[in-house]
């Protein structure tokens, strides 16, 4: 039996990888407009980076983390999400210092790892694109990040988008709400799922996020955090809503929304679509929020942050469902056909010269007959086919055919190697004269 990829992973093959490159390039272009710069952090970190930031009660830490003891007896974890590693790098490299412009804006792309049941759009190794903006408590930064997220999805031509927002308040708001929520849930303790029983006193907000049907029934009548906001938290959330309206970004307030990671506070948001490829109803494509205590929690100063992440696999499922011609067929500038073994050195030199000039060029390496080589040129969508046979070799010329117009000319090899643009112009002029 041959070797197979691990369960929950995927090989991204040529052709498919073109789509990934398109997604990454589009994201980089959008982020550049907002002055976000790329950051690259390790695929693995100290286990504590994720347990401290994500919270011991989160599913990621308690159930899904790939962690192990390395040969130096250090507790290591493969990154399950991007934010914690970026915050660790922000703190370790003292990017919070006054010499660095604030907000300090970064984005990341790359693989993440979670041990969960593989399904469509969800793998154990999956890829995330995310952004983080550090250093400003302004609600305008929340809205800038949301606006950028909406713009990014529009660039990907995702339709039927819905923005849902909520607030988790500041520390005082959450403390008051925690108390009210615990008081509400305690009489239902025996009815709660085992996970929710554990979370009830550690982080009762996570009970609201339970997927258990009985838990969901219980929390339907739970207190709403909007009723427990401090005046400052109310002002922050109201300003976010006002600024979204000023940008004509429609939104819904979803008071039941909580994020799956424990570090969020104030504004949280999800962008959803109703495309059936991800399941029934509205499904989240991108999610994020504000995390004002996370930098301090990982050893830095008190510095606010806000960001989002999206899964690339799920995004590509959507993009392919909505647009079958996601990436245009690649075009080859020139394919060089060699007729006879003695032409090999000349055709090799020619394709290298064309590549040196910035063109895409290829030739046969399987000693195939001319007919098979011409067939390959067509398959590769070559714009021009250059043919060198015994007579061309003797005359130091080449036969060039424009595959779009069908026009053919013979030119000196030196001209072809030195100025391919002139050859194209000659072909065009001849086409116009015919």
From Swiss-Prot:
Transmembrane segments: none annotated. It is found in: Cytoplasm. GO terms for molecular function: ATP binding; catalytic activity, acting on a protein; histidine-tRNA ligase activity; transferase activity. It catalyses: tRNA(His) + L-histidine + ATP = L-histidyl-tRNA(His) + AMP + diphosphate + H(+). GO terms for biological process: histidyl-tRNA aminoacylation. Keywords: Aminoacyl-tRNA synthetase, ATP-binding, Cytoplasm, Ligase, Nucleotide-binding, Protein biosynthesis. It comes from the Bacteria. InterPro entries: aa-tRNA-synth_II, aa-tRNA-synth_II/BPL/LPL, Anticodon-bd, Anticodon-bd_dom_sf, His-tRNA-ligase, HisRS-like_core, HisRS/HisZ, HisRS_anticodon. PANTHER family: HISTIDINE--TRNA LIGASE, MITOCHONDRIAL-RELATED (PTHR43707:SF1), HISTIDYL-TRNA SYNTHETASE (PTHR43707). Belongs to the class-II aminoacyl-tRNA synthetase family. This is Histidine--tRNA ligase. It comes from Latilactobacillus sakei subsp. sakei (strain 23K) (Lactobacillus sakei subsp. sakei).
């Amino acid at each position: 039996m041959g070797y197979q990829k691990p369960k929950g992973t995927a090989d991204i093959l040529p052709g498919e990888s073109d789509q990934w490159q398109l997604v990454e390039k589009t994201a980089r272009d959008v982020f550049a407009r907002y002055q976000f710069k790329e950051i690259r952090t390790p695929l693995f970190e100290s286990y504590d980076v994720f347990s401290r930031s994500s919270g011991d009660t989160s599913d990621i830490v308690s159930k899904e983390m790939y962690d192990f003891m390395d040969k130096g007896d250090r507790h290591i974890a493969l990154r399950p999400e991007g934010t914690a590693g970026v915050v660790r790098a922000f703190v370790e490299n003292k990017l919070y210092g006054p010499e660095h412009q604030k907000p300090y804006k970064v984005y990341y792309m790359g693989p993440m790892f979670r041990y969960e049941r593989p399904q469509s759009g969800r793998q154990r190794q999956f890829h995330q694109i995310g952004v983080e903006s550090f250093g400003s408590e302004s609600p305008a930064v929340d809205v800038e990040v949301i606006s950028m997220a909406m713009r990014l999805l529009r660039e990907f031509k995702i339709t039927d988008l819905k923005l849902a927002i909520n607030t988790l308040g500041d520390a005082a708001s959450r403390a008051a709400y925690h108390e009210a929520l615990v008081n509400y849930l305690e009489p239902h303790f025996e009815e709660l799922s085992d996970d929710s029983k554990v979370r009830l006193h550690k982080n009762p907000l996570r009970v609201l996020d339970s997927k258990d049907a009985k838990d969901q029934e219980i929390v339907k009548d739970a207190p709403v955090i909007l009723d427990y906001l401090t005046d400052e938290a109310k002002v922050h959330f109201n300003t976010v809503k006002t600024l979204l309206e000023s940008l004509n970004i429609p939104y819904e307030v979803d008071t039941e929304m909580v994020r799956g990671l424990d570090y969020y506070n104030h504004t949280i948001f999800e962008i959803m679509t109703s495309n059936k490829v991800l399941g029934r109803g509205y499904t989240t494509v991108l999610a994020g929020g504000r995390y004002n205590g996370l930098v301090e929690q990982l050893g830095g100063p008190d510095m606010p942050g806000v960001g989002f992440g999206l899964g690339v696999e799920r995004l590509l499922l959507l993009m392919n469902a909505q647009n079958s011609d996601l990436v245009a067929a690649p075009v080859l500038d020139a394919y060089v056909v060699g007729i006879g073994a003695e032409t090999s050195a000349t055709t090799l030199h020619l394709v290298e010269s064309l590549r040196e000039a910035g063109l895409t060029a290829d030739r046969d390496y399987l000693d195939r007959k001319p007919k098979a080589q011409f067939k390959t040129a067509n398959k590769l969508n070559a714009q021009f086919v250059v043919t060198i046979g015994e007579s061309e070799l003797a005359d130091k010329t080449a036969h060039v055919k424009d595959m779009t117009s069908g026009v053919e000319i013979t030119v000196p090899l030196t001209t072809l190697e030195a100025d391919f643009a002139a050859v194209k112009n000659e072909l065009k002029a001849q086409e116009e004269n015919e």
